[in-house]
Regions:
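Single conserved position on a long alpha-helix in the C-terminal lobe of the eukaryotic protein kinase
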Residues: 1, 110-239
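Leucine-rich, highly hydrophobic segment in Treponema pallidum outer-membrane-associated proteins
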Residues: 1-84, 119, 194-210, 219-223
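N-terminal start-of-chain detector that recognizes signal peptides
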Residues: 2-7, 39-45, 90-93, 105-110, ...
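Generic amphipathic alpha-helical segments used as scaffolds and interaction surfaces in large
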Residues: 53, 57, 68, 96, ...
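Glycine-rich loops and low-complexity Gly/Arg-rich segments
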Residues: 56-60, 93-98, 160-164
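Helix-biased "structured C-terminal domain" signature
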Residues: 57, 65, 95-97, 171, ...
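An N-terminal domain-start capping segment
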Residues: 73-103
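Edge strands and adjacent loops of beta-rich recognition modules
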Residues: 95-119
Length: 239
């Protein structure tokens, strides 16, 4: 998600490979094709097969400076998490504390997550920033109840013993003033952002904010502010 510690999977199993026909025009690249894995293999493509299709382009949820994004359905979360829990990141040794936080977040997602996720990388307003902003937006079914659930969960979460230092990150409201009225939360360390973005190396620190029917997750506070400020100013890609 744009951080120094981030990585991507260096390889993928053959069952995840796909054969695509591609068509181009001035506005888009269109791909259609087939995968060669059988339906019973645990691949991302098979996990997606169980989801309800998404229609349309989510440009109204993307800042105008977006240079990479993806959007996919999560109407069947069980199949998504069944796939992600078997990836390389899951083979790492995480503490019982982090595993417990993951379980809590899975319960939260199953209760309140909507049916689609959109994530993007986009440019900061500050040209001196070395890294882009990164955000994941998860539609939620009941924003008020979901935020209350999150607050109660955070209140009940014990402090992590021997936790690494929290990276210094600021919401930078001076640069992004229209984000100030939306409360940001720093979450206990967990791997949910890793699971839902495919990034396998992370400091596991995640920041969250509820915004107009969505739960925003980011690896730093400034990304949340930058995203909300762009949405509030209608500085978006649209269709």
């Amino acid at each position: 998600m744009g951080k120094n510690t981030d990585g991507i999977r260096p390889q993928t199993h053959l069952g995840s490979w796909a054969e695509l026909d591609m068509k181009f025009n001035e506005e888009a690249v269109y791909c259609s094709g087939i995968s060669h894995g059988v339906d019973t293999t645990r691949t991302f493509i098979n996990a997606l097969r169980k989801q309800k299709p998404i229609t349309g382009f989510g440009g109204e949820r993307l800042p105008s400076s977006t240079f990479f994004y993806n959007q996919w359905a999560i109407s069947d979360l069980e199949s998504i998490f069944d796939f992600t829990s078997r990836q390389e990141y899951a083979k790492a040794t995480y503490s019982d504390y982090i595993k417990k936080r993951d379980e809590e977040w899975m319960d939260f997602m199953k209760e309140y997550a909507g049916e689609n996720v959109i994530s993007c990388l986009f440019q900061s307003k500050d040209s001196a920033d070395r890294h882009p902003c990164a955000i994941m937006s998860i539609a939620v079914k009941d924003e008020v109840q979901a935020e209350r659930y999150l607050q109660n969960m955070l209140y009940a979460t014990p402090r992590e013993k021997d936790a690494p230092p929290v990276p210094q990150t600021s919401p930078n409201y001076k640069q992004y003033p229209r984000a100030r009225k939306y409360r940001q939360y720093m979450l206990p360390r967990n791997t949910v952002l890793t699971q839902l973005t495919g990034i396998t190396e992370s400091a596991l620190h995640t920041y969250a904010c509820f915004y107009k029917g969505a739960l925003l997750l980011a690896p730093d506070a400034q990304s949340l502010s930058a995203y909300i400020d762009a949405m509030e100013n209608e500085d978006v890609l649209d269709g």
